[in-house]
Every structure is written in structure tokens, then in C-alpha cells.
């Protein structure tokens, strides 16, 4: 009996994008890390063997070659379809039998620099570490952007090398700075303004070195002990706050640290492993570090906001793939909002899928397949690393392969996204229901209490349906906590209720106007004898038949109560209520 496909793989094929890679590199040795140069078409690859490769590529030529080969392949399929040899024209990238983009079966097969004029070449390669190469990053400082490369390995050495030649210009052995001799390095992070090189360890410590003087007399500058109870999974700088402030992920918590003073705040236990994090493209372009998106081991993305609760807990969550872990996340770095790129992040999961998540809409809007299992023996290449190259192309990598994806969307893809947005807007306008009300939806809101003074800081992160999710529709509440009813002259302010504290609206409130004509049940009941006599005298047989054919809804008449003598006397004497002053 064959293995049944799960819902996530089926959904991935439905949402699969028509965008294809322009370059694919396969490896015989496990790939542990990769980094893209911020301003040049350079790619660094670090392997479990300790080797380091630097490859350059011509992105424009690869784009043109991929487009030409795609058109030829579709044309061949079209002719075969017209001839009746195939049942349909396949445009799915994951189901192709032959690839139309540039592919190398092994990175060792890439020609070296100067051998021949090709679109991909190896600039240099070296045995950088005795153990595995765990992480590699480029220097992010503006005065030397991408000029230097930093790597760390299981040999407990951090090395600094020139990007152009690969020659080591500085290194430091960190064993003496460990609290335990069995500790190992995991992640690196460099300040965008200062020569601060941070390294995370398996025991949860953060070591800070002077990158301009690696191996000098003053080795370690700062040390933050036990930032987490377990291994450091990610380090993120906060240049908009301070060059000394950073965010770290480890085990099930997120920490805000000052490398001089230690932990500033640490989040609540999320009861799920936090694997990676990134800022939003919007805030990066505006030089802000307030909103953070964190990927989880249970297949979700959570949204955090420093201005709301000092990163004590998540604000909302977005379901991505409940059968896989989200191991990598990166912003699109593209401010072009025509395709929703400015409000999206890329995620890679353990099933080899790539998801573009629009965090403002709270859903996955595009899926690409980095790896597809073919046959029983073929395993899925889990996406462990994501990056963006100098021309905003997505780079996805697992242990077995690396792909650089095209940044050009086809007309069909853009039309499909526009149709989806229009359908969503129509559904919202008709139903008005909350998109997160489904039992399977993960876009619910945390029940953390926040001050109403900060409620304006994160409104853009929540779906517009959630902001409309107000239980009392007759008296809308403004963001300042006061009612918007002009007739209400009471100056007292009603208590402001945040969207994530409100109860979900009852479904009966969604129904506005019935599509079918309502039938008055009183018309269908048997009338009394007196009413029969009156109806026979006043209505003709033709009018009765017409009334039976098209029953009309009428408002029931309320029987007026007669005023008693005592009530009349009290009204005349003004003993109850407010007196009316005549002549004023």
C-alpha cells in the first residue's frame, strides 16, 4: 500500500509558483552554511568537511538562458499535446522531467576562474576548518561592506578572510573563553556599525570579540552567560536601538541582551523551539527594529513587537506547515509592493518547501518546491538556509543542493495573485467574518494584556477582519477609547478593548439582509372566526389568492396599554419624570 500524501504537500502543489530557479548546485558533501554577498554576485558555501567555496555567477545571463529554455520546452510540449502524445502541457516546476535551468551535479564540476567563459565559476576554494564549517557571514559595515568574510567551525576557531582572495587575515581560538571545555560555536553575527563580532555557543552563551583585532592581545571584549538554557539558534542585531543591543533565540525563548550588561528581557516559555527570526522589509527600509517574525518547530510563524510588551510574548501567529518545522526565515528585501513583496517574508521548512508569507494578510501566498522526493530511496532535502542576493533573488539551500531563484514573475503568476486578492476583498465585504475563526487557523491572538497607550504601534500587523471583530456594533469604539456616536453627549470614556481581547462575533450578526422573502408565520396559522368574517367582508377571493402566492412580511402591531386614572393624574401633576418648563 502506497504512502498517502499529507495535506501540506497537496496544498504546496496547489499554491506552487511558476517561478523557476536560474541555477542549481548539487553537493556530494553535506552543506552546512551559505552566504550571499550584499552587493556582488558572489556566493559562499561551507561544508561538513571544513571546506569553503567562493563562486561567482552572471545573474542576467542565467535569467535569459532560463527564459529561452523554458519557452522552448513549453513549445515542444504544446506540439506534443496537439499531436496527442501527451495529455496536458506541464508548467509545474516540481514535476518537470528535464530541467531548463543551469544545473551542476557537483559543485566540484564548476569551472575555475579563468578556465573558460561561463555563467558560473569558482573564484577560490580552501580547507578553512579542521572540523565542519558551521556558519559564514559577510561584514555588514558600510565602510567595508562585504570586503571580509567570517567563519566558525567545530575546531573552536573564528577566522576572518578577505572576500576577494580567501586569504585569512585574522583568527581567534575561543576555547579559553568557554565556561565548559565541551562547548562549541553555533552562530555568528556582526554589528552593522561597530567592530563587534558575536558568537553563540551550544551552552547558551554569547561571546563578543573585536573583529578589527582578531587574535590580538585583547581577545574577548564581552561575554553574556546563559542567554538561553540551550544552544543559540540565531543572533540578530538591533542597530536602530543601539550597537550594544541584540536579539537571541535559544531553546523555547527569545532574549533581548545588552552585550555590556547581560539579559535585558527574556520572553515567556513558548513551549516550542524557536529556530530563526528576521525583521520585516518595511521596518528595515525605515531603519526600525520593532517588529520581529520568529519561526517555530511546530510549523508556524509568530509576530513579536518590542513596543507592545518588551518582547515578553508573541502577539499573533500564522500557520505555515503544521507537519514540518520552519528552519529558516528571511525578509524579501524588496520594497516593490505590487506583488506584496514589501509585506512578505520567505520561509523554508523541513519538507523541502519554500513559502512566501504575507504577514499583513496572515497567510501563505506563494509556495516553491526546493526539493521533491522521487521514489522510495530519494529523501527530501530540508531547507536549512535562506538568503537574498544582491538583486533580490531568493537563495535556498539544504544539505544536498542550493538553488538561486529567478526574480521575474510571469504574467500568469501576477494575474493569479491579483485574482486572489480581489476574491479575498469580495469575501471580506460580503461576509465580514474573521479569517482566523476557522478551527484549523493559527492566526489567533495571544491573550497577553497590554496598555492601551501603545495600541497604535502594531495595528498594521493585524488583519483588517480582526479589527472589525467588535461585539458591540451599535457603539463603535475609537482608537482613543471614546465612542464615535455623535448623538452621545456623555463625556465619559468607554473602556478600550484591544482586538486580541475581544470575543469572536456570533455568526448570526454577520447576516445582514435575507436573500429570500420572509414569510409571516401568523399568516399561515388558522384565523379566528371573527377575523374570518372580517376578511370575507373586506377582501375578495382574488386578493386572498394573491396574498397566499406572495406572502409579505409585516411588522406585528403592538397593543397599546391604556393609561389608568392614577397615571393620568400623575402626568398632569408632573410627579414623575422631569418637569417641562414652559416659556424657556
Curated annotation (Swiss-Prot):
One GO CC term on file: nucleolus
InterPro entries referenced in this protein's UniProt entry, alphabetically: WD40/YVTN_repeat-like_dom_sf, WD40_repeat_dom_sf, WD40_rpt
Disordered: annotated segments: 409-497, 516-563
Keywords, in A-Z order: Nucleus, Repeat, WD repeat
Family: Belongs to the WD repeat WDR55 family.
Protein name as annotated: WD repeat-containing protein JIP5
Subcellular location: Nucleus, Nucleolus
Top-level taxon: Eukaryota
Organism the protein comes from: Lodderomyces elongisporus (strain ATCC 11503 / CBS 2605 / JCM 1781 / NBRC 1676 / NRRL YB-4239) (Yeast)
Intervals holding WD repeats: 128-173, 180-219, 269-314, 378-415
SMART domains to which the protein is assigned, alphabetical: WD40
GO biological process terms held by the UniProt record: positive regulation of transcription by RNA polymerase I; ribosomal large subunit biogenesis; rRNA processing
Gene: JIP5
Listed Acidic residues bias regions: 412-429, 450-460
Record field: compositional bias (Basic and acidic residues): 483-493, 528-552
SUPFAM superfamilies with a match to the protein in the record: WD40 repeat-like
Keyword Repeat part of the UniProt annotation: yes
Amino acid at each position: 500500500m502506497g504512502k498517502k500524501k499529507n495535506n501540506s504537500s497537496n496544498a504546496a502543489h496547489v499554491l506552487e509558483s511558476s517561478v523557476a530557479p536560474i541555477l542549481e548546485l548539487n553537493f556530494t558533501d553535506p552543506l552546512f552554511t551559505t552566504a550571499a554577498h550584499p552587493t556582488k554576485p558572489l556566493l559562499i558555501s561551507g561544508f561538513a568537511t571544513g571546506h569553503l567555496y567562493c563562486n561567482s555567477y552572471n545573474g542576467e545571463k542565467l535569467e535569459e538562458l532560463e527564459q529561452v529554455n523554458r519557452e522552448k520546452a513549453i513549445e515542444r510540449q504544446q506540439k506534443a499535446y496537439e499531436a496527442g502524445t501527451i495529455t496536458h502541457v506541464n508548467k509545474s516546476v516540481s514535476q518537470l522531467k528535464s530541467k531548463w535551468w543551469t544545473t551542476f551535479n557537483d559543485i566540484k564540476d564548476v569551472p575555475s576562474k579563468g578556465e573558460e567563459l561561463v555563467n558560473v565559476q569558482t573564484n577560490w576554494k580552501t580547507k578553512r576548518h579542521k572540523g565542519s564549517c558551521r556558519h559564514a557571514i559577510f561584514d555588514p559595515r558600510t565602510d567595508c561592506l562585504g570586503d571580509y568574510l567570517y567563519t566558525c567551525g567545530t575546531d573552536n576557531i573564528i577566522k576572518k578572510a578577505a572576500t576577494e582572495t580567501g586569504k585569512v587575515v585574522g583568527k581567534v581560538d575561543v576555547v579559553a573563553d568557554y565556561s565548559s571545555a565541551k562547548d562549541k560555536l553555533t552562530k555568528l553575527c556582526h554589528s552593522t556599525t561597530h567592530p563587534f563580532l558575536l558568537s553563540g555557543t551550544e551552552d547558551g552563551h554569547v561571546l563578543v570579540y573585536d573583529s578589527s583585532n582578531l587574535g590580538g592581545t585583547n581577545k574577548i571584549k564581552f561575554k553574556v552567560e546563559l542567554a538561553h538554557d540551550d544552544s543559540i539558534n540565531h543572533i540578530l542585531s538591533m542597530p536602530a536601538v543601539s550597537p550594544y543591543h541584540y536579539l537571541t533565540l535559544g531553546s523555547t525563548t527569545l532574549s533581548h541582551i545588552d552585550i555590556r550588561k547581560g539579559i535585558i528581557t527574556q520572553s515567556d516559555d513558548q513551549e516550542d523551539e524557536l529556530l530563526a527570526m528576521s525583521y520585516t522589509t518595511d521596518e528595515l527600509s525605515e531603519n526600525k527594529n520593532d517588529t520581529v517574525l520568529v519561526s517555530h518547530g511546530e510549523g508556524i510563524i509568530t509576530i513579536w513587537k518590542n513596543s507592545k510588551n518588551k518582547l515578553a510574548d508573541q502577539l499573533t501567529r500564522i500557520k505555515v506547515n503544521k507537519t514540518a518545522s520552519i528552519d529558516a526565515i528571511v525578509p524579501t528585501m524588496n520594497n516593490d509592493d505590487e506583488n506584496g513583496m514589501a509585506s512578505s517574508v520567505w520561509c523554508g521548512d523541513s519538507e523541502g518547501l519554500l513559502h512566501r508569507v504575507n504577514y499583513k494578510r496572515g497567510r501563505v501566498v506563494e509556495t516553491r518546491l526546493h526539493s521533491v522526493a522521487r521514489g522510495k530511496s530519494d529523501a527530501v532535502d530540508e531547507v536549512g538556509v535562506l538568503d537574498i542576493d544582491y538583486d533580490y533573488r531568493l537563495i535556498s539551500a539544504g544539505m544536498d543542493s542550493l538553488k538561486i531563484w529567478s526574480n521575474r514573475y510571469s504574467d500568469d503568476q501576477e494575474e493569479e495573485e491579483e485574482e486572489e486578492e480581489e476574491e479575498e476583498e469580495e469575501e471580506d465585504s460580503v461576509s465580514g467574518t474573521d479569517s482566523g475563526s476557522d478551527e484549523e487557523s493559527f492566526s489567533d491572538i495571544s491573550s497577553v494584556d497590554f496598555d492601551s497607550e501603545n495600541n497604535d504601534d502594531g495595528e498594521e500587523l493585524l488583519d483588517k477582519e480582526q479589527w472589525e471583530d467588535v461585539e458591540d456594533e451599535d457603539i463603535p469604539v475609537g482608537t482613543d477609547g471614546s465612542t464615535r456616536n455623535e448623538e452621545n453627549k456623555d463625556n465619559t470614556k468607554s473602556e478600550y478593548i484591544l482586538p486580541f481581547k475581544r470575543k469572536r462575533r456570533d455568526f448570526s450578526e454577520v447576516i445582514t439582509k435575507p436573500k429570500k422573502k420572509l414569510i409571516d408565520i401568523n399568516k399561515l396559522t388558522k384565523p379566528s372566526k371573527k377575523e374570518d368574517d372580517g376578511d370575507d367582508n373586506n377582501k375578495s377571493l382574488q386578493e386572498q389568492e394573491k396574498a397566499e402566492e406572495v406572502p409579505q412580511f409585516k411588522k406585528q402591531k403592538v397593543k397599546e396599554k391604556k393609561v389608568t386614572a392614577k397615571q393620568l393624574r400623575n402626568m398632569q401633576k408632573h410627579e414623575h419624570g422631569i418637569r417641562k418648563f414652559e416659556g424657556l
